[in-house]
Curated annotation (Swiss-Prot):
GO terms for cellular component: cytosolic large ribosomal subunit. The keyword Ribonucleoprotein applies. One of two assembly initiator proteins, it binds directly to the 5'-end of the 23S rRNA, where it nucleates assembly of the 50S subunit. InterPro entries: KOW, Rib_uL2_dom2, Ribosomal_uL24, Ribosomal_uL24_CS, Ribosomal_uL24_KOW, Translation_prot_SH3-like_sf. Belongs to the universal ribosomal protein uL24 family. Residues 45-77, 96-115 are annotated as: Disordered. This is Large ribosomal subunit protein uL24. NCBIfam families: rplX_bact. PANTHER family: MITOCHONDRIAL RIBOSOMAL PROTEIN L24. Keywords: Ribonucleoprotein, Ribosomal protein, RNA-binding, rRNA-binding. GO terms for biological process: translation.
């Protein structure tokens, strides 16, 4: 999965289709993301010492990563994410629609000849 926390995404499927928000959490094992303001549910909380008031909490639930697309920073439209190697050997993410860089993933690897 190529999503990162704080990426701006748009929901492309489901009840919140069209909603824009930042990614708050990424679960790579389950292939799910939590998007700010999307997939909100009421969680009923029982009274306890930790929560003496009890009541209902409105919280975001995880959604499948396939239901969101990254928003291209230059155009503001949904785009796919690609990975490319730079000349110095480091990897970066880029928006496929515009080719704009989305930040470095990994630094250049050290040469194996040195070992």
């Amino acid at each position: 999965m190529k999503f990162r926390v704080d990426d701006e995404v748009i929901v492309i499927a489901g009840a919140d289709k069209g909603h824009r928000g930042k990614i708050l959490k990424v679960d790579r094992d389950k292939d799910k993301v939590v998007v700010e303001g999307a997939a909100r549910v009421w969680k009923h909380v029982r009274q306890s010492q930790k929560n003496p008031q009890g009541g209902r909490l409105n919280k975001e639930m995880p959604m499948s990563a396939s239901n969101v697309m990254l928003v291209d920073p230059s155009t503001g439209k949904p785009t796919r994410i690609g990975v490319r190697y730079l000349e110095d050997g480091s990897k970066e993410r880029f928006a496929k629609a515009s080719g704009e860089s989305l930040g470095q993933i990994a630094p250049a690897k050290a040469s194996k000849a040195a070992s």
